[in-house]
Amino acid sequence: MELLDKLTILSDAAKYDAACTSSGVRRGFQPGKIGNTTSSIAGCCHSFSADGRCITLLKVLMTNCCVYDCKYCINRRSNDTRRAAFTPQELADLTIQFYRRNYIEGLFLSSGVLRNPDYTMEQMIHALRILRQDYGFNGYIHAKAIPGAAPELVQQLGLLADRLSVNIELPSQEGLQLLAPDKTKDAILRPMGQIRDQARQSKAELVKYKHAPVFAPAGQSTQLIVGATKDSDRHILHLTQSLYDRYKLKRVFYSAYVPVVEHSLLPSVDTKPPLLREHRLYQADWLLRFYGFRAEELLDEAHPDFNPLIDPKCSWAIAHLEQFPVEIMRADYEMLLRVPGIGPTGAKRIISARRTGTLRFEDLKKLGVVLKRAQFFITCGGRVRSGLQFSAASLVRQLEAVEQGQLPAAQMQQLSLFDPAG
């Protein structure tokens, strides 16, 4: 098979993997090396580096041949599809050629399971060794560890890649048994624990020895498929919280299930991917990582799924109206973070600006506050925004209008040239 045909097949087969990011990795310039994406920070496909640039990578599978028969996967053993596999040399050459043509600045490498997990990982490691050692490639590499592979192979992969990830795929053990019987929860979580421990050990050794080998400096991530099973948002979010707490993941990615195969246990191929649900989970994930929320605060047994029409932070605020409205001039940083429309940067600016005078609603816009959401939950100097209603039902209606791009009536005012000043 021609190399171009392999690339076409294996790049297309990799498109369902959402876990592409490079946050947290720093690769400085090294004399005699190639693949430096910036003078200080390397990046990943369609994510942003610290200087605001969008970084691209070559995103491919080592092979789409697979001994597993996961019912949701287009590359499953029983699916009738074109198969291909790169040799390690082919993949390394292809990556270098793409880099030298300025198409990419890094590599995202995953794979189906060819023969067994160990053999597949050996092929991936061989390809990355050629890139790093023979070609001196210093660009960003994100590699997928194969569940069930030997610990020593996971270690070797982590010494070659900037980021590792082990995909959980399905949020529950029941889902795995039903749709991916060849995979087990233990086989997925074991390498996660190893990556966590070895990354921690690597950081400790770097403090003592400047040239100690670096293990997965950009950490690890995972991916969850949303919509292939009946797991609730609450279950998914509690799993996410546990992964962040126990395994110190950098990111959990959510992938709306795209029906690509017909099966009685899966949504029909006519079902639209739950993209809005995926979006709400990402918003909730952001609240866990940067806003101090916990999963149990956002959803409960009575409300196991997010309202698709309102973002999770607004939903939480409406459910806790006893804490609102918040007085902008007195609220502490943690409380400001819980106000819809106010993020970490906005909260810090508010605390700084209010030291010099009383803030008005108009001032908040200049500080980066999203006033179309925040206005419902704050007072400025004891004043409430005119024309707003504060019952839960009215807030839901008004915020749904905001989400749909319609401003509340209180905001829609045409100024007149002949109005008296004041």
Residue ranges and their predicted role:
Residues 59-60, 89-100, 207-208:
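Short, charged beta->alpha transition segments
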Residues 96-112, 284:
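Short Fe-S-cluster ligation motifs
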Residues 1-65, 370, 378-379, 386-422:
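Flexible, acidic/Gly-rich N-terminal and inter-domain linker regions that tether
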Residues 265-337, 373-422:
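Long, highly charged, low-complexity intrinsically disordered interaction regions
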Residues 60-89:
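Canonical Radical SAM [4Fe-4S] cluster-binding loop centered on the CxxxCxxC motif
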Residues 57, 70, 109, 166, ...:
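Conserved, mostly hydrophobic/aromatic
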Residues 92, 115-298:
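Conserved AdoMet/S-adenosylmethionine-binding subsite of the radical SAM
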